Swiss-Prot record:
SMART domains: AAA, ClpB_D2-small. It comes from Shigella flexneri. It comes from the Bacteria. InterPro entries: AAA+_ATPase, ATPase_AAA_core, Chaperonin_ClpB, Clp_ATPase_C, Clp_N_dom_sf, Clp_R_dom, ClpA/B, ClpA/B_CS1. Residues 159-340 are annotated as: NBD1. Residues 555-765 are annotated as: NBD2. The modification N6-acetyllysine is found at residues 96, 176, 640. This is Chaperone protein ClpB.
């Protein structure tokens, strides 16, 4: 018999049988060796064949191994083993059986039939385990589905459904799928489409994270619970595993061969299987190379004939990009749109999946946490969908609580570090012999014993609390298993088991859980095991940088004295500081309009009066850093074409992928201060873009993504009307001054732009009394720089007065003061430090000498 007529799997098994014979020191390769190799072959046909025939493959393996151990062993064969006469006879019989069936190649399942028909040890073992020619022949027919073996790789295509799909109905029976809450309309629509005669293939389309895959899992659960029409009862839902289908397909045509195997197996099932293809768009173009047919085209005939019941799932963008372009594929699917659930529906979904997260993380998730996860994620996470983003919040909050439970509590950790510190000191003092050291050692020993006692008591308490928590989790896990068991009993109609669980085990476990929970509530001091709305807010703040947690007392006080904080840096300008402070307080108190930015202001005034400085002070107050603001110099946007830099270039232009300067900055940091400096210098088209930001708190970038501006403070500065402010300052009160300036502003900006700004703030010119305070603020920065180099500096009142007089200019504001400090203080100081006149460690005094500021030590 020619060995090249064996299929690939059979040839591999023969090589394995040779190795097995060598390993057992047998002189010949017996049928037993080959049968053992076939049984243990990964992805082989023999093991599933025997299972299909109702034979215990495990028992057969044991019997064959015992028979192998009884075979005669020969030492010094030198690695040369030959097939025995028995094996040659069985292989020839395989050839005969293959020819009878019209096969071009000999497949491994025929070896079992041939072994039964020939006499020998293997035939006796097979018959003892219940194998007969009749049941093996029937199992072979069932496996082949009326097909012949026409190529060497035929066996690789078998069991394709088992290799390349995941059985969702089986997972639902085992209770491994999360419960699906709501989505009744979408599941009903999917069932309606599946019940059609032709084109019975629904495709679920929706944004990422709305629960498309969950709908199919819900369908699988309904099928096993019998909550579907007669036409769908008993069906299996199989999810196609594209990763397994593509992985390892090295040669041209191998992928197509595997997919063809899946489609053939599905055809054999005669409509009893619903195939679920997640990320359906991956099928279009999969396996395509140099004009080869892709997976999408291979599916079309089966879909059109109704042989394949398929449910697809893909996102809106990918459906448009891949499926709609292929009209022939699109018409074979029926669209089922899956919308994002409302906040109320999301709360119901979260309540349904809550128990799974509690079991995994061993924590308790409170109802306020669930409500907070749904409402806060809906408001603050704009670029993702419910319920996915809310589930992620719950998951991460539970994970952080679990991490705290597993790690040592802070109180214990602090005591532990203190004990180590005291022990080190004790070791050092034991080497000393003087009286003071001995006295200190006695005191130290006393403190050490006290700390160790405290530590052991706390450790006991911590261990008891951990044990209490793990006890609760064990009961919860048992209760979950009991609920799965009652469902399984209900499906098979085992009433005795149902009553035993429903009226015996489950009430008992619930009673135990209630008792354990009460005990847990009383004793918990070191460990937190509850996820509350505060934890959800913490996680959200970490994700987005938006402070949504309840305000601590310190933050309340800080917000109430916000004006004083800002006045440390911005001198005068009370109206501007009040306007900004009130906007921030409204936002943190939850009174601001949720669909607009926190505040939008137009700062008007002469140069150098503190417009930009107030923005920096606000960023510092909110984020502890001057850099935490998006600063855009509008003088860069004077040309019409430069507007696209703010939101990103349109498709087809260079830089399209990079995104916009303004939109990208806000996407990365949604809670920020946006400063549009010198806004009147920008092109008028820029203001058209800003209208959406100021009114609705959103902006669409060049790639079509909506960017959320609702948590930003938008501040625009301008010099418009500054000449009026300079001229009439002192003559008019603030209200009249503002009215005059607004008249100038209305000539430069459109009414719809001014109308959308929360407040237009007019800055006063600075007086001499303000300049002295500003001089002190600027000198403090100089003192800080000198302190780092070891110099201490003081300025006399006369020197400060002279500096203020020299630095005051009503037209240019505070900027000339900076130049005065540079020329009159910094330049002479630099020379004296470099020449060695001023040395570190001694106080430098700045005094007036002949109308000049001099530094002396």
């Amino acid at each position: 018999m020619r060995l090249d007529r064996l299929t690939n799997k059979f040839q591999l098994a023969l090589a394995d049988a040779q190795s097995l014979a060598l390993g057992h020191d047998n002189q010949f390769i017996e049928p037993l060796h080959l049968m053992s190799a076939l049984l243990n072959q990964e992805g082989g046909s023999v093991s599933p064949l025997l299972t299909s025939a109702g034979i215990n493959a495990g028992q057969l393996r044991t019997d064959i191994n015992q028979a192998l151990n009884r075979l005669p062993q020969v030492e010094g064969t030198g690695g040369d083993v030959q097939p025995s006469q028995d094996l040659v006879r069985v292989l020839n019989l395989c050839d005969k059986l293959a020819q009878k069936r019209g096969d071009n190649f000999i497949s491994s399942e025929l070896f079992v039939l041939a072994a039964l028909e020939s006499r020998g040890t293997l035939a006796d073992i097979l018959k003892a385990t219940g194998a007969t020619t009749a049941n093996i022949t029937q199992a072979i027919e069932q496996m082949r589905g009326g097909e012949s073996v026409n190529d060497q790789g035929a066996e690789d295509q078998r069991q394709a459904l088992k290799k390349y799909t995941i059985d969702l109905t089986e997972r639902a029976e085992q209770g491994k799928l999360d419960p699906v809450i709501g989505r009744d309309e979408e599941i009903r629509r999917t069932i309606q489409v599946l019940q059609r005669r032709t084109k019975n293939n629904p495709v679920l389309i929706g944004e990422p994270g709305v629960g498309k895959t969950a709908i199919v899992e819900g369908l699988a659960q309904r099928i096993i619970n019998g909550e579907v029409p007669e036409g769908l009862k008993g069906r299996r839902v199989l999810a196609l595993d594209m990763g397994a289908l593509v992985a390892g397909a090295k040669y041209r045509g191998e992928f197509e061969e595997r997919l063809k195997g899946v489609l053939n197996d599905l055809a054999k099932q005669e409509g009893n299987v619903i195939l679920f293809i997640d990320e359906l768009h991956t099928m279009v173009g999969a396996g395509k190379a140099d004009g080869a047919m892709d997976a999408g085209n291979m599916l079309k005939p089966a879909l059109a004939r109704g042989e394949l019941h398929c449910v697809g799932a893909t996102t809106l963008d990918e459906y448009r990009q891949y499926i709609e372009k292929d009209a022939a594929l699109e018409r074979r699917f029926q669209k089922v749109f899956v919308a994002e659930p409302s906040v109320q529906d999301t709360i119901a979904i979260l309540r349904g999946v809550k128990e799974r997260f509690e079991l995994l993380h061993h924590v308790q998730i409170t109802d306020p946490a669930i409500v907070a996860a749904a409402t806060l994620s809906h408001r603050y996470i704009a670029d993702r969908q419910l319920p996915d983003k809310a589930i992620d919040l719950i998951d991460e909050a539970a994970s952080s609580i679990r991490m705290q439970i597993d790690s040592k509590p802070e109180e214990l950790d602090r005591l532990d570090r203190r004990i180590i510190q005291l022990k080190l000191e004790q070791q050092a003092l034991m080497k000393e012999s003087d009286e003071a050291s001995k006295k200190r050692l006695d005191m130290l020993n006393e403190e050490l014993s006290d700390k160790e006692r405290q530590y052991s008591e706390l450790e006991e308490e911590w261990k008891a609390e951990k044990a209490s928590l793990s006890g609760t989790q064990t009961i919860k896990a048992e209760l979950e298993q009991a609920k799965i068991a009652i469902e399984q009993a209900r499906r098979v109609g085992d009433l005795a088991r149902m009553s035993e669980l429903q009226y015996g085990k489950i009430p008992e476990l619930e009673k135990q859980l209630e008792a354990a929970t009460q005990l847990e509530g009383k004793t918990m001091r070191l460990l937190r095991n509850k996820v509350t709305d505060a934890e959800i807010a913490e996680v959200l703040a970490r994700w987005t940088g938006i402070p949504v947690s309840r305000m601590m007392e310190s933050e309340r006080e800080k917000l109430l004295r916000m004006e004083q904080e800002l006045h440390h840096r911005v001198i005068g300008q009370n109206e501007a500081v009040d306007a900004v402070s009130n906007a921030i307080r409204r936002s943190r108190a939850g009174l601001a309009d949720p669909n607009r930015p926190i505040g939008s202001f137009l700062f008007l005034g002469p140069t150098g009066v503190g417009k930009t400085e107030l923005c920096k002070a606000l960023a510092n107050f909110m984020f502890d850093s001057d850099e935490a603001m998006v600063r855009i110099d509008m003088s860069e946007f004077m040309e019409k074409h430069s507007v696209s830099r703010l939101v990103g270039a349109p498709p087809g232009y260079v830089g399209y992928e990079e995104g916009g300067y303004l939109t990208e900055a806000v996407r990365r940091r949604p809670y920020s201060v946006i400063l549009l400096d010198e806004v009147e210098k920008a092109h008028p088209d820029v203001f058209n873009i800003l209208l959406q930001v100021l009114d609705d708190g959103r902006l669409t970038d060049g790639q079509g993504r909506t960017v959320d501006f609702r948590n930003t403070v938008v501040i625009m500065t301008s010099n418009l009307g500054s000449d009026l402010i300079q001229e009439r300052f002192g003559e008019l009160d603030y209200a009249h001054m503002k009215e005059l300036v607004l008249g100038v502003v209305s000539h430069n900006f459109r009414p719809e732009f001014i109308n959308r700004i929360d407040e237009v703030v007019v800055f006063h010119p600075l007086g001499e009394q303000h300049i002295a305070s500003i001089a002190q603020i600027q000198l403090k920065r100089l003192y800080k720089r000198l302190e780092e180099r070891g110099y201490e500096i003081h300025i006399s009142d006369e020197a400060l007065k002279l500096l203020s007089e020299n630095g005051y200019d009503p037209v240019y504001g505070a900027r000339p003061l900076k130049r005065a400090i540079q020329q009159q203080i910094e330049n002479p100081l630099a020379q004296q430090i470099l020449s060695g006149e001023l040395v570190p460690g001694k106080v430098i005094r700045l005094e007036v000498n002949e109308d000049r500021i001099v530094a002396v030590q």
